[in-house]
Amino acid sequence: KNSLTIDVASQSASFGGRLLNLGPRHYELLYLLVTNKGEVLSKQALMKKVFPENDESDTRFVEVYIDKLREELNENLDNPKIILNEGTTGYKIVGSHTIVRRALKETEGL
């Protein structure tokens, strides 16, 4: 079963053991969804947190970034199973998630 792991120390995430290719804002968006698991986060609230320099009523940024996160999670964009739309107002995340507060183990040098 695929589970999502968020590594707070390195600001990275992996899904099913595969490191996700996320920029800082993608990570922040994913972190907000995971730390509010099961709760609907409005597009405006996500705009305010992740894109504070933009008008929070212009939610296209959030929509584009959510689509990129879904692609990284190998989601079917027409029928997502992990990051769910809640009407037209927001998103919530479901499934198995782990938050790690220490860095992922690095391979030791020789």
Q: Predicted segments — roles?
A:
Residues 12-87:
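Positively charged, aromatic-enriched patches within helix-turn-helix-type DNA-binding elements
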